[in-house]
């Protein structure tokens, strides 16, 4: 992407909207399946009063509460949640839940669930598999949990009880063989011919 201005002058912001096409050479092995830079995205949420849950999958660590997901206090029943599409189908291995900067407004508990939308309906609550049961978390803390998951996941649901903010959420795992093959093809097809010539050894076979 190249921006040209004539003859000069300033630009406050430039937004280019689309879907991330990650370089598959960085997706081989254990990666953050949820990261926006790898193609993860927010697809549903209950509340984004102060800040969107899309923030918690952005690169790097948050520098303040405004760079995480900050929801409003709930006055009724229920709990807040966010649903994400993973970069591709993969097997989750461990998760990091970061409540840094959230001191008086961190969740009391969190829960994680996953689903493989290739063979199940994400609108069917009974089709989701629990990755992390409802677990107490501390304010202003980075929590890490090892997951025991047999199958692949494509979507992740985060539930916070009853509400509360997070700085970041990382879901580390391995893409399945077909997902990695599809990622290679998508990336290759998105390259201009002049770029393909520079990485000819990466052409899908």
Where are these regions (language model features)?
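Hydrophobic, ordered structural segments
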Residues: 1-32, 151-178
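Beta-sandwich interaction modules
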Residues: 1-9, 79, 86-90, 128-166
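Extended, low-complexity, turn-rich repeat/linker tracts enriched in Gly/Pro/Ser/Thr and Asp/Glu
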Residues: 9, 100-108
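Short loop/turn segments immediately following beta-strands, especially the blade-tip
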Residues: 21, 116-121
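Intrinsic, low-complexity N-terminal interaction/targeting segments
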Residues: 55-74, 121-147
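Short beta-strand elements bearing conserved aromatic residues within extracellular beta-rich modules
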Residues: 110-112
């Amino acid at each position: 992407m190249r921006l040209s201005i004539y003859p000069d002058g300033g630009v406050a912001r430039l937004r280019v909207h689309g879907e991330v096409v990650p370089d598959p050479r960085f997706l081989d092995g254990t990666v953050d399946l949820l990261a926006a830079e790898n193609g993860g995205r927010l697809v549903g949420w209950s509340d984004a009063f102060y800040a969107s849950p899309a923030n918690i999958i952005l690169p790097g660590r948050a520098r303040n509460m405004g760079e995480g997901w900050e929801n409003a206090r709930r006055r009724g029943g229920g709990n807040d949640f966010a649903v994400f599409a993973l970069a591709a189908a993969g097997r989750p291995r461990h998760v990091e839940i970061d409540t840094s900067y959230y001191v008086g407004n961190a969740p009391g508990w969190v829960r994680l669930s996953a689903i493989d939308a290739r063979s199940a309906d994400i609108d069917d609550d009974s089709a989701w598999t629990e990755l992390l049961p409802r677990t107490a978390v501390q304010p202003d803390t980075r929590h890490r949990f090892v997951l025991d998951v047999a199958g692949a996941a494509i979507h992740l649901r985060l539930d916070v009880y009853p509400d509360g903010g997070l700085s970041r959420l990382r879901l580390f795992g391995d893409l399945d063989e077909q997902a990695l093959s599809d990622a290679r093809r998508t990336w290759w097809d998105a390259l201009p011919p002049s770029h393909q010539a520079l990485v000819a050894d990466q052409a899908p076979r």
